[in-house]
Amino acid sequence: MLLKIKIKIRLFEKRYTIYFFLLKGKNKEEMEIIKKEFEHLVISELESSMLQKALDYSLTIVDIIKFVEITNFDIDPFMIDKFWHTMYDNSLLYISRDILEWMGYTGEFGEQRKAFKKLLKRKNINFTELSNNDPTKHLYPEIQKDSLLLSNAVVSQSKWIIMNSDDFKDSILMLNTKNSGKIRKYYRSFEKLLKLNLLYTLKFRERADKMQISSLETMMEEMRLERKQSEERSIKQEQLLLSIGYNLKELQEQKEEDTQKIDVLIDQNEDLKQNIEETNDKLDSVVEKLGIAVEDRAPRLKRASIRERFVLFKKNNSTNEIYQYYAIRGQSVYVNGRLSKLQSEKYPDMIILIDIICQPNPRNLFLRFKERIDGKPEWENNFIYAGNNVGCSFKLEKEMINIFKSLDEEKRDV
């Protein structure tokens, strides 16, 4: 049968429904007919050379991130970093100066925010503003980065725009700036990427099934040949035994025993075919979830200076400060600046304990550290934190480092 997956999106202030199709036929003939219909529907919109390049890359299926790398698919890394990651974990997004400039707003930071808020109000799009003394401000490291660009007087009066992922998505699709065309082009490119990757998964599965079936047919042919040879041997043995007067009862028993062994092997082969069908069903589920999986990862940014980074250092000062550790999260260029400033002005003897480059969501990493600590008496009573500051006994320093490293490794889990 042809399984249809429906995905709803909103483009240019209108809602559209996109259908993707997965194959599940009852027999080989039905599968071939359905596959031809699917190719007629989809292939005309795809670049077949990119698809073939991905198929030729490996006999193991690759994820969407590797797929983009292999095919050199043209997609905006900033959009993935600032939008699709937010969509994946459903977190709130701070509208930073970088985002406003990416959307095409020009001028001073304050003027950019005013222009964007004007659009939001005109289109009745929800947003929130945090005052400078809001206790949740520390959840958005880029607020601190943007604050450095403003005077203290302006910072004290500033309000920082916060939006959820759906509202942010609506807003960028309603832009009328110099970059609005590029942003809409991104959505069209992303739709093509989804279709191309789903077709890649289909083709990969088809190839894998053919390889399995070919191997299985070879095995069955060998078993049929063995059975035929066994029967021929039995006939010859009967003839030989008859010629020398042996009792045919013993020969018949041996023949039945051989036949039973062959039947057992055939039954085992049928079990193997059933296992393959169950594996295919599981793969159907994987293909169906690809629409979610594409949001789970993002290609690495080409410019190292704007890749996200997470650093934890030990202050190593002579005071008895309860918070002896400090975390910095943000783009690499920002982290380098903060480290230099803190080392020259406050912590000349600092020791960097953790430096994770290209951590896709460093803020998320720090929050998950707190989540891991909370509720566990063996850790909760021995760790304290305030903002980016962390305190623990020196005996637990190694344990703290291991927790961060373990949390970072979880980004590789699919």
From Swiss-Prot:
Matching InterPro entries: DUF3627, MSV199_dom
Entry superkingdom: Viruses
Coiled coil: 209-293
Statement: the UniProt record of this protein carries the keyword Coiled coil: yes
Keyword Coiled coil attached: yes
Keywords: Coiled coil
Pfam families per UniProt: DUF3627 (PF12299), MSV199 (PF10553)
Protein name: Putative MSV199 domain-containing protein 148R
Organism of provenance: Invertebrate iridescent virus 6
